[in-house]
Amino acid sequence: MDGGKLTTVDLKSIIINDPFWNRYIDLVDHVILPFQWELINDQVEGAEKSYCIRNFRIACGDEKGDHKGMVFQDTDVAKWLEAAAYSLAKKRNPKLEAAADSAIDLIARAQCEDGYLNTYYTITGEKRWSDLLEGHELYTAGHMIEAAVAYYEATGKNKFLHVVCKFADYMCTVFGKEEGKIHGYPGHPEVELALVKLYRVTKMTKYLELADFFVQTRGERPCYFLNEDCVKNQNFIFPEFKDFDLDYNQSHMPLKEQETAEGHAVRAVYLYSAMADLAYEYQDKELLKQCEILWNNIVEKRMYITGSIGSASYGERFTTDYDLPNNSNYSESCATVGLAMFSNRMFQITRDGKYTDIVEKALYNTLLAGIALDGKHFFYVNPLEVVPEIAEKNPTYRHVKTTRQLWFGVACCPPNIARTLASLGNYVYASEQNTVYVNLFVGSRIETDLSSGHVELLLSSDYPVKGDVTLEITPEMDGQEFTVGIRKPSYSGKAELSVNGIKEAVCLEKGYLYLTRKWKAGDKITVVFDVSFRFVRCNPRVRDNIGKVCLMKGPMVYCLEEADNGKYLASDIMDSSVPPKEEFDESLLGGTMCAGLEGMRIDYSRVGDTLYEEERPSYIKDTFKAIPYCCWNNRGKGEMIVWMREK
């Protein structure tokens, strides 16, 4: 943990202008945020009701009625506000800001005199903090805090920040080691990382100390949850909790003893993100080491090639090493967001490019697969193989949706996707003292202050269609000396770097190319990475992928879809000895780099109705078209497959 922690570049100082990402970023500003505002106000016909804003109106006395929705329904508006804040940080939008301010006014009026804020417990009158296992009070508080911090940093308005500070002050009087306080912790981690954010913006150490208390206390014996009424009397809000062991919420042992990622995937990576934050703030090398162990277990043994996590639908959880089924997995969009958050924090502490590789994998694949290109339909679950006729009839796959949905009763994923896209700049760059880091190759312009002075960078690329990346440097004054660190992706076997057309020898350290020199206005760094198509194979311990290949280009995973290749994709066999052909399809989804593959398929015209027989099926040679996994299901319902049989 040598040196200071890297910091992200202020979103106000980043302008993204990228041929690939613009369509998604523009969706957030022009479609997703207005649409989700209508959704949380229950104004979209045909979508599941949110009841979120309605609950706040009831809680503050504007309306009469019962609480509806989940115990954590308040987080719908919290995550929407956070996404709105990131959007406003880039560009002021009076209409969006007015909507956000109206929601904040409502939240402020729903807050209790002592600072408590939660519509479910306020409206129902149920006892506060009586069901930490599943009541989600602290989880909901965490998302409120994250939203308030983001809104303050984006707009300078402090009303929402004051609301959550009052709430956090109250929580500090309720929870802690002291006698008379509750010695418990959240059933769903989230407030821990939020309290660290609140500490960083307010410098109030009691918020950091409370976050540390929650993390350090988790898993102690006797387990706090076992003494709660819901467990003792089997009186659960969520009936399935009766089947879950303590590893479901990572409370089965102290965190510094946990070496495998267990339980609910979102809970896990939110918790690990907080652990990474606290490891830095307290310079706790032991806690950081535990983060590394857990991260390695996820990435090396429990993560899908698309950057998604959570193999089982029941419990939305991790299972065991190398258990990665393709058609029944859960792979929740929120879990992918959490993995990106955890990985980005680990990069900021260690400056190791392996963590950013996973951020990139998660963002380019599962995150984008979670949203349709109309910005109004979403996936909660992200399988790697779908046969609609089976998924819709077999209850084993009841969690798998064969088309994206308008909204969900548990709608954590749509606003989570929105807030991640809106804050993309946080993942693209980082800086420390006199070094600026380029992590993702997203066309953009940034301004930042280093110890040597002000610096402006203009990044141009058509990544990952092409591997060329150009950085134009504008220092505060000619002769200004500083370092540029550019990530060399692990999938690029080579990287050619030049400055003003002249090749440069650079230092490669932990996946980053470092170039230190005295810069002048107009200097251009050009890096060429290898993003050609490649076939990737899986560790044979993953039974589902034996004898199969996956096609990738740069960080992007590709798949076969019924719209291009017909039915029975699981029987198609790819000839990996034939290099894939680049096929840019202007008409597909606004222009998409596809791949032409050669192989063979079963001749189903010669297949009869006999269920079992001795004769082998007949194969015929054919060509196939693969598209980016993130683009699947934008042309109607149909089969999809990522892992293809290999000749």
Segments (PLM) and residue ranges:
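A conserved hydrophobic secondary-structure block that centers on an alpha-helix together
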Residues: 124-201
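Low-complexity, Ser/Thr/Pro/Gly-enriched N-terminal "stalk/linker" regions
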Residues: 1-76, 101-120
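Active-site neighborhood of glycoside hydrolase catalytic domains
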Residues: 188-190, 195-223, 233-309, 313-320, ...
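Hydrophobic core segments within long, regular secondary-structure runs in both alpha-
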Residues: 18, 25, 29, 37, ...
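C-terminal beta-rich recognition modules with glycine/proline-rich loops and embedded aromatic residues
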Residues: 13, 19, 211, 291, ...
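Beta-strand-rich binding/interaction modules
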Residues: 479-499
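Carbohydrate-binding/catalytic loop surfaces
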Residues: 50-70, 118-136, 186-198, 228-264, ...
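Well-ordered alpha-helical scaffold segments within catalytic/enzyme domains
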Residues: 21, 81-94, 142-157, 192-203, ...
